[in-house]
Swiss-Prot record:
Primary enzyme class: transferase
Identification of the protein by name: Serine hydroxymethyltransferase
Alphabetically ordered keywords of this record: Amino-acid biosynthesis, Cytoplasm, One-carbon metabolism, Pyridoxal phosphate, Transferase
BP-aspect Gene Ontology terms: glycine biosynthetic process from serine; tetrahydrofolate interconversion
Cofactor: pyridoxal 5'-phosphate
An annotated Gene Ontology molecular function: glycine hydroxymethyltransferase activity
Role according to the record: Catalyzes the reversible interconversion of serine and glycine with tetrahydrofolate (THF) serving as the one-carbon carrier. This reaction serves as the major source of one-carbon groups required for the biosynthesis of purines, thymidylate, methionine, and other important biomolecules. Also exhibits THF-independent aldolase activity toward beta-hydroxyamino acids, producing glycine and aldehydes, via a retro-aldol mechanism.
Species per Swiss-Prot/TrEMBL record: Brucella anthropi (strain ATCC 49188 / DSM 6882 / CCUG 24695 / JCM 21032 / LMG 3331 / NBRC 15819 / NCTC 12168 / Alc 37) (Ochrobactrum anthropi)
Description of how the protein assembles with itself and partners: Homodimer.
Positions annotated to bind (6S)-5,6,7,8-tetrahydrofolate: L134, G138, H139, L140
HAMAP family: SHMT (MF_00051)
PROSITE patterns on file: SHMT
Similarity comment: family membership: Belongs to the SHMT family.
Keyword Transferase: yes
Amino acid sequence: MSQANAAAKNASSDVFFNASLEDIDSEIFGAIRNELGRQRHEIELIASENIVSRAVLEAQGSILTNKYAEGYPGKRYYGGCQYVDVVEELAIERAKKLFGCEFANVQPNSGSQMNQAVFLALLQPGDTFMGLDLNSGGHLTHGSPVNMSGKWFNVVSYGVRKDDHLLDMDEVARLARENKPKLILAGGTAYSRVWDWKRFREIADEVGAYLMVDMAHIAGLVAGGVHPSPVPHAHVCTTTTHKSLRGPRGGMILTNDADIAKKINSAVFPGLQGGPLMHVIAGKAVAFAEALKPEFKLYAKNVVDNARALAEELKSNGLDIVSGGTDNHLMLVDLRPKNATGKRAEAALGRANITCNKNGIPFDPEKPFVTSGVRLGTPAGTTRGFGVTEFKEIGSLIAEVLDGLKVANSDEGNAAVEQAVKEKVMALTDRFPMYGYQG
């Protein structure tokens, strides 16, 4: 090879290994930079979102993304896995310690895939299972007819009572006795009250069903000791690793049953997934280590305290909260007292730099893409450092936008009110910088 060719080769290699994202792909760099600006200057109230630590970001963006590792620690189908084995073993042991369980599978890539893995392990196509109705706060993977869970299985949905919007446990028991499901799924994405895991297990045992708990939304609160744990009661628990747990986006499956654990492991790999995302598993391990620290318990307590403060402030400003309040990190806000829809409210609040999502309320007369409510959550704001005082202010700002929207009575909203609130929001977020950023 000539000296010129060798120099060119070395230069190319130097660029590949050392050039920055900004140098290589300015378009993607720009989109990421703009998203960072959005996160810094907006109040994040989407209940399923949170903010990870710099340590989690560093782990997830590491060279572990290069490594294929099909199988499980000590039983891989590829060589060179001795260090990623350490990573996954740490994630497993930390998860077990965090939730007090005997077995943990940390490989699921998402919440949907973790639930699919349990179905694959414990059910056959056509089997009957019960889950919370989507309109009562359930999830697509809990039996929605548009989801695989609703297409492959016979789904019997339970819901909340019409008068108080609390889980109707009498209905759960009646439906279980009538339909003899093979599995009962408890947990949801928009239910703001404490779940009675013990009662669910009693019903499951009575009809000979597995009890599966999807605690994706409340896992951080369970880990922090401010919500009862389902682990002692359920045959199997699933959870995402983001949301209130404050880790990278992904899933996890927990159980105390060795036979179920074996079935779960086979269902995840090779049944559902191939090579696990080792860089994400590293991020999970870091997040679990953070959640095992004493300060995480204070974080979880603050999440709930902040949610209650926000709910009470909204009520004092004339809004209704589904079920009357919250015991966890989220609430459903009934917008009908302000003559607003979820679609309009989400857009108006977004223009004021307050991010949330439209959400159906129980027995909602509006269409799913319109809705009568919005779902609000406090995990991200609490991570940022907001306390009760700030969430009361946020509640007042939300009411201000909705009152302006009511006066405008149009999709365009009230520009003057929204701009005034936006300025207040930016003043608030500037006091609570993210990732070392000031101003």
